[in-house]
Amino acid sequence: MTSPVLDFKFTAPPADSLAHSSSGNHMAIVRDRTPKPPRNPHLRGLQCLRCDALYPITLTHDGCPACKRAGFHVALRASYLPDAPDAMPMPYGPGFTLGEGHTPLQDMPALAQRFGVARLGLKDESCNPTGSHKDRMTAVGVAQALDFDAHTLVLASSGNAAVSAAHYAWAAGLGCEVATYEGMPATYARQLDALGARRYVFADNAGRWAFVRERSQYPGYFALTNYRLPALGSAPLAIEGYKPIALECLNDGGLPDHIVIPTARGDLAWGIYAGFRDLLAAGRIARLPRLWLVEPFARLSRVLAGGALNGSYPGHTAQFSTAGATVTYLQWQAATATGGGAVVVGDDEARAARQVLAGAGVSAELCAAAGLAALQQLRDSSAIAADANVVLMLTANASSDPSWPDRPV
């Protein structure tokens, strides 16, 4: 069935909007709601990434008002009391989960030798329950939705986040609404429809974000992803779900020197940075790894070269998971605070890298394969030395990638 195109004509969501079909027909579904998870008693609020102003936690995420008045569009982060006992505090204790996290860090000695580094590990996030790193963020986002008595998740997504949200919402007894685009891969669309998620189709990010922003103002709706332009990033507490990647990398492969991360708006990169920052503050590590954010065309690269952080940097790419024209303070901070940077990898380079990974028995979505091409660039420029311990983030495999299988390169 074809989902409706709303074209900015929004109506209040129906009162019985717990679950919908993609055609807009209500589904008579009764599911048990998951109990509220235990909130960390040391979680004190949300804090600005730039000015450190402290704000209460709500279901909306509109950035720092003080910085906005000064002309900056800056996200907030979770803030914990200084006497929090954990080296890596999280917003919620054990509760709702589908088994996300603790993904393997695959040691790839042959690829390490080929690319001239001492150690190369692939952090395989495709082993998460719905096949991507998004499950980590979604799990914490669902915990917040349950904590604040929300009944529906709403988000803008090109695929992986939508599938993750639909599965987790279904399991938790929540509704799910997804603002997407006409070309959403059929494999994703079928999963959303089967799980009762409602799809809305828009021509561009502006339309999708406007829809999510509108929905977020209604009682009981929780926006999981960004809805602001200039972009801010996803829900701050949800992004905390990426922090454990840092501890997993440390435990499984030692402290990396460099981590190469496919990036759209920087949620994943900032979450990894925050995890290592916690470990540094706790004395578990002596330094931060350098984070390299891989993009399909120049966005953050242009900002780091002097462009406006809140500018628009459009481009075309088959790397649909990391497409988009915006740059956030999140990704800028993740790169600059760690001494890393941005690497541009075009589609042909990414396809060639995906073939190299396939030869090593690794399936990767195109933007994840781009990380291997980025490693080659960083070695060629001597930004990464021969004695380095490098981790590549494999965000998802190729199975649902609309650009797969590749044409010959």
Q: What are these model-predicted stretches?
A:
Residues 135-139, 154-172, 186-189, 265-272, ...:
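Short glycine/serine/threonine-rich phosphate/pyrophosphate-binding segments
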Residues 207-226, 230, 278-366, 407-409:
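Active-site/ligand-binding loops adjacent to catalytic centers
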Residues 141, 145-168, 172-181, 257-268, ...:
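A short, small-residue-rich loop immediately preceding and capping a beta-strand
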Residues 37-105:
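N-terminal juxtadomain amphipathic helix
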